[in-house]
A protein has these predicted regions:
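Flexible helix-coil transition and linker loops at the boundaries of alpha-helical arrays
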Residues: 25-28, 40-45, 145-150, 183-193, ...
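Single-residue signature of alpha-solenoid repeat helices
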Residues: 13, 35, 69, 104, ...
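Residue-level recognition of tetratricopeptide repeat
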Residues: 3, 58, 92-93, 127, ...
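Helix-start (N-cap) detector for alpha-helical repeat units in TPR-like alpha-solenoids
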Residues: 28, 50-51, 84-85, 119-120, ...
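Conserved structural position within tetratricopeptide repeats
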Residues: 22, 43-44, 74-78, 110-113, ...
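Position-specific recognition of the canonical hydrophobic site in helix A of tetratricopeptide repeat
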Residues: 6, 61, 95-96, 130, ...
């Protein structure tokens, strides 16, 4: 509207651009090329507006004009350094397009400090820590400061479970996973069952070492079934060799040789087609 008023040399442009600058930015994603002209006009008419360069940066980034996008976001951040999303965007751009890990982490941490209620930024900050190989125990300790945020996102719950498994806290991982109902999400295929099975296999190995063979059998048999709360079913051709191998070991310890051999034979069965 402001751009149209400017083109028509009509009154009221100042009021319209001032109002636009104060609008909530949620779900506002300019995506047409003509929006570039309108946003540039807004920046000229209201140089103190931090939202126009933010929107312009989003549009440029979508069109793969990464340097222009970052320049626009930097302008937005200078005008309003309390807007977390622009720092988040800059963090991702510096990491993915400039390979500047230190600056990316600095900006993402700043974004989260500005809004510690944003579960998405927490997830993205942890993923940055993961990419720069932050120790598992440090990441776990950081995440567990925000249990309410973790509970909002399946991927954060899964990351906590994964870190528990990676730090050897298999009982905690198992308990947390069994208490949560997951929903399918793109890119998450197979990740929840993998952690479900990992915790049980490691606990089964501990049970075997301690001579608790029946406990090990129960845990390993659970690996062969996908309960509903995992949010996905078993795929055809799922590799279960290790479960069968340890089941064979458990039955051997119980002097049930025939069953042990049967499970070991199942453990030798693999894909019938060659893989790359």
């Amino acid at each position: 509207l402001g751009w149209c008023l400017v083109q028509g040399e009509l009154p009221g442009t100042g009021q319209v651009f001032a109002q636009a600058a104060e609008m909530c930015p949620d779900y506002c994603f300019p995506n047409r090329l003509e929006a570039i002209l309108a946003l540039q006009c807004a920046m000229e008419q209201n140089p103190h507006d931090a939202k126009a360069p933010y929107y312009l940066g989003n549009l440029y980034y979508d069109k793969r004009q990464y340097d222009l996008a970052m320049e626009a976001w930097e302008t937005s951040a200078r005008l309003d350094d309390n807007f977390p999303t622009v720092w988040r965007n800059l963090a991702l751009a510096y990491f993915n397009k400039k390979n500047e890990e230190t600056k990316a982490i600095e900006y993402m941490e700043r974004a989260f400090r500005l809004d510690t209620t944003d579960a998405r930024i927490l997830m993205e900050l942890d993923q940055l820590y993961k990419r720069v190989r932050r120790p598992h125990k440090e990441r776990l300790a950081f995440l567990r400061q925000y249990p309410d945020l973790i509970e909002q996102r399946d991927d954060l719950v899964l990351e906590e479970i994964t870190l528990l498994n990676q730090t050897g806290e298999y009982e905690k991982a198992k308990a947390l996973l069994d208490a949560h109902s997951f929903h399918p999400w793109e890119g998450g295929e197979g990740k929840v069952p993998a952690q479900y099975q990992l915790a049980r296999v490691e606990l089964a190995k501990q049970a075997l070492t301690a001579g608790n063979n029946q406990e090990a059998i129960a845990l390993l048999e659970e690996c062969l079934e996908y309960p509903h709360h995992l949010g996905e079913g078993k795929l055809y051709g799922a590799q279960e060799n290790d479960f069968y191998y340890f089941l064979g070991c458990a039955y051997e310890n119980l002097n049930r040789k025939d069953e042990a051999v049967r499970y070991w034979e199942q453990a030798t069965v693999g894909p019938t087609e060659p893989a790359a």
